[in-house]
């Protein structure tokens, strides 16, 4: 890290200009000055009356190591010789009211393990990365036209040791990575790893934005974890929270005794949703703090993406009874995304946004917010409501399963089956399913089949892959003992086969963001709650036919319109006995009958299983059949696309 001496910094740069290397100025840096080794401490506290550095080295006496104010706008700095790495410290701040408060360093790269709250001097330099091959391979791929399967996890509750203690970053590399590789996930998405005092905030209420939480080890240990992920071809996405922060006394809240990182106006300062305070995104120093932080994680931890939390809460003010857009946040998000993509054009910037704000994933030069992905919260809510409904009543809410295709190409979407839907009394995905024991597993297999064949990249929260029965319990690990039960083993086998099929089937991801990649065969069979559609790849011969039955009825010789290929094979049936189903499968090759049906040139007659999904793949290339106007048959959607980034 290239530490910049404060006296050499242009006086107003941090305060008035875009300065995205603020971590080079602020924090605690091990340096040599005047031939003496020590630590240079620098902090921004614009309304402090006086500042000092305290720690074990001076018995926490705030009179000993007074800091020098080096800019009128409140940058303070001090070099203390003979202090070494691992020294704990805080800033003692004399406020304008005459009080002395003690704060952790906003730019510290390491902190004490909770419940202790001091910052720790740490030399973040020195880790030797081994992921050049990963970087080269990533450059050759498009984030839009590749398969993407994201495994969302909470680091502290995926798995614990027998004595209930946490695995370290290095130990998790040994435990987690082989599991992720076995399941063929392309990425892991980790809930926030910034330092945070309260375990049950899951990291979303942070105090140390530059400090990887010490619960699991040192920053270098986390670098090793990311390095190992890259070694095995796994991308790493971090949850990141630039909208709000916690009110713990040692953190950013009222940092110098006055609103510093948060809004001054009480009406917009408080975030009543989480009991936190909102970052003042109109303040240049706060923007530089946050955007520098994003680039810090990219540069020093080689992170491949951010899932930006609570974008909806940022875009609109929290004022009661009002829905007024926050132009500070809009401008900040655009600036953030421009800075991130200038650093790495292949980075993943995903917005967790439940609003109808337009052009979230459009480039800023087109008037968009500049993200390249957005969680499809509407799809998630509609589909889960549909699945929770008793099967005999699903025909009355049929549109919940078709509505998403009316806007599927308005943004670049990720379909999330996330942690938010399996906690706080919402039940696990398996337990959301109505009916008896067998019905629940059959419908979860069906849901996953629909999930993997619907346009959009995929995200699943941990435990869903084997049918976790209880909802997520953040203080415990997953119920790994469920593998002792046959139906959970069947579910696990099915999920692995489904994800493998997804990854090797270009029609399921190649045109995720183009209307050319999807066509309804029959979207209107509400009486039987059966949906059928085509997924299409770049090549016309790359096509899959998907049929989903959301009731327990079995149908023999059911006619489904298909593109004009000669034969079809069933490549996956969720009702197969090896997955715990009843065995209503289509074993034989299906000959396409050359009679139009469902606006297709031909049709097949198949067995449709109860609560089942059947995926058909053409055996031979298309015969070049002609439509009545003489043109070749072409799979095409009736929805329009805004276009890709």
From Swiss-Prot:
InterPro entries given in the database record: A-amylase/branching_C, Branching_enzy, GlgB, GlgB_N_E_set_prok, Glyco_hydro_13_cat_dom, Glyco_hydro_13_N, Glyco_hydro_b, Glycoside_hydrolase_SF
Sequence segments annotated as region (Disordered): 619-645
GO biological process, one term: glycogen biosynthetic process
E.C. numbers: 2.4.1.18
Recorded GO CC terms: cytosol
Pathway(s) served: Glycan biosynthesis; glycogen biosynthesis
Start-end of Polar residues biased regions: 636-645
SMART domains the UniProt entry points to: Aamy (SM00642)
Active site (record annotation): 309 (nucleophile), 352 (proton donor)
Gene Ontology MF terms: 1,4-alpha-glucan branching enzyme activity; cation binding; hydrolase activity, hydrolyzing O-glycosyl compounds
Main EC class the enzyme belongs to: transferase
Annotated SUPFAM superfamilies: (Trans)glycosidases, Glycosyl hydrolase domain
Highest taxon of the lineage: Bacteria
Reaction catalyzed: Transfers a segment of a (1->4)-alpha-D-glucan chain to a primary hydroxy group in a similar glucan chain
Keywords, alphabetical: Carbohydrate metabolism, Glycogen biosynthesis, Glycogen metabolism, Glycosyltransferase, Transferase
TM region positions: none
Family, per entry: Belongs to the glycosyl hydrolase 13 family. GlgB subfamily.
Subunit structure, interactors included: Monomer.
Role played: Catalyzes the formation of the alpha-1,6-glucosidic linkages in glycogen by scission of a 1,4-alpha-linked oligosaccharide from growing alpha-1,4-glucan chains and the subsequent attachment of the oligosaccharide to the alpha-1,6 position.
Name of this protein: 1,4-alpha-glucan branching enzyme GlgB
């Amino acid at each position: 890290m290239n530490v910049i001496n404060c006296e050499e910094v242009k006086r107003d740069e941090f305060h008035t200009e875009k300065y995205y290397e603020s971590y080079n100025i602020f924090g605690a840096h091990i340096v040599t000055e005047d031939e003496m080794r020590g630590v240079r401490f620098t902090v921004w506290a614009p309304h402090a009356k006086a500042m000092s550095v305290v720690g074990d080295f001076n018995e926490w006496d705030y009179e000993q190591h007074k800091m020098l104010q080096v800019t009128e706008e409140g940058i303070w700095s001090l070099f203390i010789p003979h202090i070494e790495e691992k020294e704990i410290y805080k800033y003692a701040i004399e406020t304008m009211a005459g009080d002395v408060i003690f704060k952790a360093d906003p730019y510290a790269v390491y902190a004490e393990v909770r419940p202790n709250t001091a910052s720790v001097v740490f030399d973040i330099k020195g880790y030797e990365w081994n992921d050049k091959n990963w970087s080269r391979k990533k450059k050759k791929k498009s984030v839009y036209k590749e398969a993407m399967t994201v495994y969302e996890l909470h680091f502290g509750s995926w798995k614990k040791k027998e004595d209930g203690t946490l695995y370290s970053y290095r130990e998790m590399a040994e435990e987690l990575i082989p599991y992720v590789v076995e399941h063929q996930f392309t990425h892991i998405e980790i809930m926030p790893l910034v330092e945070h005092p309260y375990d049950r905030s899951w990291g979303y209420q942070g105090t140390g934005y530059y400090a990887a939480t010490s619960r699991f080890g040192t920053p270098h240990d986390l670098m090793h974890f990311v390095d190992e992920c890259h070694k095995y071809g796994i991308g790493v996405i971090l949850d990141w929270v630039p909208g709000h922060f916690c009110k713990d006394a040692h953190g950013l809240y009222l940092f110098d005794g006055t609103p510093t990182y948060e809004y001054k106006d009480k009406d917009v300062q408080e975030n009543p949703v989480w009991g936190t305070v909102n970052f003042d995104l109109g303040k240049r120093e706060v923007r530089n703090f946050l955007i520098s932080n994003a680039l810090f994680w990219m540069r020093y931890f080689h992170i491949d993406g951010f899932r930006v939390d609570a974008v909806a809460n940022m875009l609109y003010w929290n004022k009661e009874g009002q829905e007024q857009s926050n132009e500070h946040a809009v401008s900040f998000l655009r600036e953030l995304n421009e800075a991130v993509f200038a650093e790495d054009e292949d980075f993943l910037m995903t917005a967790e946004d439940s609003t109808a704000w337009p052009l979230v994933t459009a480039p800023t030069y087109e008037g968009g917010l500049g993200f390249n992905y957005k969680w499809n919260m509407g799809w998630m809510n509609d589909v889960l409501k549909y699945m929770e409904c008793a099967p005999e009543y699903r025909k009355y809410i049929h549109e919940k399963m078709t509505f998403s295709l009316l806007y599927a190409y308005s943004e670049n979407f990720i379909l999330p089956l996330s942690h938010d839907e399996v906690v706080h009394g919402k039940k696990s995905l398996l337990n959301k399913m109505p009916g008896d024991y067998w019905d629940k597993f059959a419908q979860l297999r069906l849901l996953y089949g629909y999930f993997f064949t619907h346009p959009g990249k995929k995200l699943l929260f941990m435990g869903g892959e084997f049918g976790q029965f209880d909802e997520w319990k953040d203080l415990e690990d997953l119920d790994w003992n469920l593998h002792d039960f046959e139906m959970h083993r069947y579910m696990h086998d099915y999920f692995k086969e489904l994800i493998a099929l997804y990854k090797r089937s270009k029609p399921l991801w190649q045109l995720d963001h183009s209307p050319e990649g999807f066509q309804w065969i029959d979207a209107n069979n509400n009486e039987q709650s059966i949906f059928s559609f085509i997924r299409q790849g770049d090549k016309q011969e790359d096509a899959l036919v998907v049929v989903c039955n959301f009731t327990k009825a079995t149908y023999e010789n059911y006619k489904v319109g298909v593109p004009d290929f000669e034969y079809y094979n069933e490549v996956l049936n969720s009702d197969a006995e090896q997955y715990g189903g009843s065995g209503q499968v289509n074993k034989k090759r299906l000959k396409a009958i050359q009679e139009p049906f469902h606006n297709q040139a031909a049709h097949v007659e198949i067995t449709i299983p109860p609560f089942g999904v059947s995926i058909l793949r053409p055996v031979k290339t298309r015969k070049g059949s002609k439509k009545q106007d003489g043109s070749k048959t072409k799979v095409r959607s009736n929805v329009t696309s805004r276009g890709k980034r």
